[in-house]
Amino acid sequence: MKKFSFSFLLFLSLLFLNVGATFAQNIYLRAGEFTLKGTTVKGFENYVEISGVQFGAEAEVSFTKGTGPAIGKPTFDAISITKSVDKLSNELLRSIATGKSFPLIEIVVAARNSQGEQRAAHKIELQDVFVTKISDASAQCDDCGTLAESVNFVYKSIKITTYSFDPKTGAPTANANPFEFDISRMIQDF
C-alpha cells in the first residue's frame, strides 16, 4: 500500500508540475522604438514585460415597461497595465506631460505551445494612445525586484485578436474574425 501511495503522489506532483508549465503565460507591451531590445525572450525582443493588464467595456441598460431591456452606446474603459519601471517609463511620463500620443501600442499575452515556445495567444492593438495616469509604488523587502508602476491608457481604436495553437506543430493561427472598433466614430474599424 505504501508503494502505491508514494507512486500515486509522485504521479500527481509530476502532473501538476506539467500543468503549470503548460498554462504559464507572460504579458508583453510594444510601443515602437521605445521598447526596442526590451526583453531577451525569443519573438518578443522589441517588447517590455508587464505583470498585468485590465480592460473592459460597458453599455448602459434601461428597461422600459413591456418592451424589455434597451442597450445604449458602449463606453470603453481605459486600459490599465502594471509593470516594473523600465526603459519605457520615462517615455510614458513624457507622453503624459506633453499630451503626445503613441501611434500604436500592442499588448500580447503569450502562452507556451506544445513545443514549449512562447507564442501570442491574445493580442490587443491600440491606435492613437494617450497616457492618462501613472502611479509608482514601492515596498521595502529584502529581495524585491524594482519599483512598480501602474499606467492607464485611452485610445482612439482597438483591435483584439485571439490565437489557437496546432497541437502537433505548436503553430499559432489567428482567429479569422478579430474584434475591431473605432471608438471616436463608433464603428467596427481599426
Where do the language-model regions lie?
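Positively charged n-region of N-terminal signal peptides that target proteins for export
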Residues: 1-4
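Bacterial N-terminal signal peptides
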Residues: 8-18
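Glycine-rich, low-complexity intrinsically disordered segments
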Residues: 22-190
